[in-house]
Amino acid sequence: MPTPLRPRLPLMSSDTGFAVRSAAFYAALFMLNGIVLPFFPVWLKAKGVEAALIGIILAAPPVVRIIAIPLITANADRRDAVRGTLIAASALCVAGYALVASVEGGLVILVAYALTSFAITPIMPLLETYTLRGLGARGRAYGPVRLWGSVAFIVGLFGAGFAADVMAARELIWLIVAASAIALVMAVNLAPLSAGDTTPAAPSPAPRRRLLRDRAFLVVAVSAGLTQASHAVYYGFSALDWSKAGLDGTAIAALWALGVIAEIILFAFLNRLPAVLTPELLLIVGGAGAVLRWIVMAFDPPVALLPLLQLLHALSFGMTYLGALFFTHRHAPPGQAATAQGYLAIVLGVTAACATAASGWLYGAFGDKAYAAMALVAIVGCGYGAVAHRAARRVSGDAA
């Protein structure tokens, strides 16, 4: 079993500095996300940006990440400067959001936000690389560190919601600027990686190209990408569906929060999971959870069943994400940890973008039955997880 699943809890050890500082940055980063996701579009509308252009602006991060992530993560690997790159990207993020806040006109905002996205999108794969490397060297658990990101996401979501009730919509951007500044402070506060934490730098682009031809890595990335992409209808249309079913905004927010709470519980007890749950098996369990979740959602379940379905988020999202994350961390060649996490992030982003684009048409044509299509996507993702598991067992048997 990979080391990150089984070690002692980092916050129960005397060696808390690295874990606490990493958790603080996760919290700041996810609090920022909890504000940006629901309220950046509200600000754009208040600025007078047309709906069609808002959609284009919001599409900037998944488009920009295809270029930004491999360039920046590879440079961080080459210079062995993951922490320094995190600080630089966080500083550019603050400057970028301040620029977005100060410009006028939809097209100018689009350009400013695209430039900001160039700094934002590599932060998560860089942070995962930094955290897994440092915690692994210290024999500490990943879950109790990462869960603070999910907690902070809920805090940011509800906190910004309360602020939006008392602030003018045109001022919401300054909440985003302030949250990004807090993230920068937490990035600067990250503990430096010691010599024992680092890995040799990659000597040339050739090994990176080999990673893209690595069948095991690609199978895992596609498995996780498809299962994560199967959430597209849920992310885009669940609130609309539940509103039609008579739920008010508070109830809808509570259901969304319940899914994140399930994820938090998974992270909290991650080191107590059975050792038999390899990364490949996590992909299978996560995919199976997604299949069950979307099949039931396709048949217009009663409101009383929705909380139970939301708890499946721990499987459909949480286990899938962890399986891909841990596999990539273990499988990355020396000097390519950030690059490998970057490639994984690109696959997840591209598959999610494609599914999101298709989800609008599916929901418009079939309504709730669009979830059945998402179940099919998850079945394929689960199948790729089974292929990865079978290959891992074969390799293990050969090694024995």
Model-found features: residue ranges?
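Juxtamembrane intracellular "pre-TM" segments in multi-pass secondary transporters
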Residues: L5-T16, L190-L226
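Helix-loop boundary and gating motifs at the non-cytosolic
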Residues: S13-P62, F217-L255
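Hydrophobic core of transmembrane alpha-helices in multi-pass small-molecule transporters
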Residues: A27, G96-Y97, G106-M124, G225, ...
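Helix-to-loop junctions at the C-terminal end of transmembrane segments
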Residues: I66-A81, A164-D165, I265-T278, Y363-G364
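Structural signature of the two symmetry-related core transmembrane helices
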Residues: G84-A98, L281-V296
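Cytoplasmic helix-loop-helix junction between adjacent transmembrane helices
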Residues: Y113-W148
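Symmetry-related core transmembrane helices of the 12-TM Major Facilitator Superfamily/SLC fold
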Residues: L172-N189, A370-A388
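A late C-terminal transmembrane helix in Major Facilitator Superfamily
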Residues: A338-F366
